[in-house]
Amino acid sequence: MRYLWIGGGAIVLVVAIAVAVGYALPVKHRASGESTFKATPDSIFTLITTVEAFPTWRSGVKAVEILPATDGRKRFREVSGHGSITFVVESTEPNKRLVTRIDDKSLPFGGTWTYDLSPTGAGRTTLRITEDGEVYNPIFRFVSRFVMGYDGTIKTYLADVGKRVG
């Protein structure tokens, strides 16, 4: 019984520390990453804007639902094993830039993703992704900072693009 109390106390202490650290972390963060691919800006832009095809190349995305547009802006919902997230396309500059925003106020996080494409010559393109994120829940702030890493999803996305375009 004594070990049960010690184990339970240790769990409570770890959770309390995670909450305290989470409260100390800022709500907003910025993370970015980039990779260069053997593909033209046009082919990369087509890949990242054809959201209906995400389940065929993005790891973790099981389905994409196209939703009614808001103020003429495309909206879609990504479905994964962890749930779903609704996005809205804030702006596009064909073959140069895409900006999406999480469009779901019920989530404990939000923010925008900016995809910048730069031709680097010889049919190669650098894709830079910048996340301007917000994590409202202190426990999620702790997890996103110390467990997943702010750039974890960006790294996965870039790796998925690389697998798709070669």
Which role fits each region the language model picked out?
Residues R2-P68:
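Hydrophobic ligand-binding cavity/cleft-lining segments
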Residues R30-S32, G83-F87, F109-T114:
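Short, surface-exposed coil-to-beta transition loops
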Residues E34-K38, E65, R77, V88, ...:
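Generic structural detector for well-ordered beta-strands
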Residues F37-A39, S80-H82, E93, S106:
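A generic beta-sheet turn/junction motif
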Residues K38-P41, A69-D71, E90-K96, D116-T126, ...:
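A short, structured loop/turn motif at beta-sheet edges
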Residues S43-I48, F54, F76, V89, ...:
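Hydrophobic pocket/interface hotspot
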Residues E52-T86, N95-R97:
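Short beta-edge strand/loop motif at the mouth of beta-sheet-based domains
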Residues I102-T156, V161-K163:
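Beta-strand/loop substructures that line and gate deep hydrophobic ligand-binding cavities in soluble
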